Swiss-Prot record:
It catalyses: a lipid A disaccharide + ATP = a lipid IVA + ADP + H(+). The keyword Thylakoid does not apply. It comes from the Bacteria. SUPFAM superfamilies: P-loop containing nucleoside triphosphate hydrolases. The gene is lpxK. Disulfide bonds: none annotated. This is Tetraacyldisaccharide 4'-kinase. Belongs to the LpxK family. GO terms for molecular function: ATP binding; tetraacyldisaccharide 4'-kinase activity.
């Protein structure tokens, strides 16, 4: 989804949220019961001989997980580990699951975020609805630790470390479960995870946070010169098919661009005509969109890469948690 219903974010909850509270209570109860079943062993988890780090959320839509997953994978590699990344592959339409993701994979087959991670980290990446089966492909590739991009609610996947990413601006919305609010699980689920990390400072929610730092613009065309992108002050068409497009538009405005926003649904399968806006103004899109649009976008098109940068105390705690993975067992 590109934008959430406004009443999901309104505190205190308004009449629409209250009207849906019975359904939200039912949904939340089912999620609690399902998790309890896994904890008690009534529903069997998969088994993996290596530690698993789950990076997920309880808020629907984008919270900035994928850049943090890339940072975690890079950090593990710098520690001498052999990380692999597993993902559901949202948006992918492959007929064969699970499957490995290569740098030249078709995003329509494997999904945009897994392809972005494969290209950005150089780590083995595997996708599939059954993340345990996908993780087995990573073991065959020699990985000694698995990082799951999303999957907090995929309880069949065992985990040694659970990290939840929240949006520092939207927080937990109105604090209610679907369909009355934006939460995939009740808010008290956060008390059971190893670390809650906010994308942007949110002291009322957690002391741990990171920021997304934009890099220099890069052209979509492979044969284009890396320099020559639009200067700040230029009016640009901004394209974002992510969970929270407004955040991308605000980033461009913060860099000095005059933005004509074009929000699309998350994981949107673009067609060429959707990226032509009837003028010769430059187009800037997210890196996640760029992996799908290299052959579709107009000539004057760029993407804005971002990387996660944990603040010092958060970085220290994350590194300490990752360093002791060898002593942790999956649960």
């Amino acid at each position: 989804m590109s934008e959430l219903p406004a009443f999901w974010l309104r505190r205190p909850p308004d009449w629409r949220a209250h009207a849906l509270r019975p359904l939200a209570a039912l949904y939340g109860g089912v999620m609690r019961l399902r998790r309890y079943g896994y904890r008690k062993g009534w529903i069997r988890r998969g088994r993996l001989p290596v530690p698993v780090v789950v990076v997920g959320n309880i808020f629907v839509g984008g919270t900035g997980k994928t850049p943090l997953v890339a940072w975690i994978a890079d950090t593990l590699a710098a520690m001498g580990r052999r990380p692999g990344i597993v993902s559901r592959g949202y948006g992918g339409r492959s007929r064969e699951w699970p499957r490995r993701v290569a740098a030249d994979s078709d995003p329509a087959e494997v999904g945009d975020e897994p392809l972005l991670l494969a290209r950005g980290t150089g780590c083995p990446v595997a996708v599939g609805p059954d993340r345990v089966a996908a993780a087995q492909l990573l073991l065959a590739a020699g990985c000694d630790v698995v990082v799951s991009d999303d999957g907090l609610q995929h309880y069949r996947l065992p985990r040694a470390l659970e990290l939840v990413v929240c949006d520092g601006h939207r927080g937990l919305g109105n604090g209610l479960c679907l369909p009355a609010g934006p939460l995939r699980e009740p808010a008290d689920r956060l008390a059971d995870v190893d670390m809650v990390i906010s994308n942007g400072r949110a002291p009322a929610l957690t002391p741990w946070w990171f920021e997304l730092v934009p890099g220099p613009l890069r052209p979509l065309a492979a044969d284009a010169a890396p320099e020559g992108g639009p200067e700040p002050g230029t009016t640009v068409h901004a394209v974002a098919g992510i969970g929270h497009p407004a955040r991308f538009f605000a980033t461009l405005e913060g860099l000095g661009y005059r933005v004509i926003p074009h929000p699309f649904p998350d994981h949107h399968p673009y067609r060429a005509g959707e990226l032509r806006f009837g003028d010769d103004r430059p187009v800037i899109m997210t890196e996640k969109d760029a992996v799908k649009c290299a052959g579709l976008a107009p000539a004057r098109s760029w993407f804005l890469p971002v990387e996660a940068r944990p603040e010092p105390a958060t970085r220290e705690r994350l590194e300490a948690s990752l360093a002791r993975l060898h002593s942790l067992t999956n649960r």
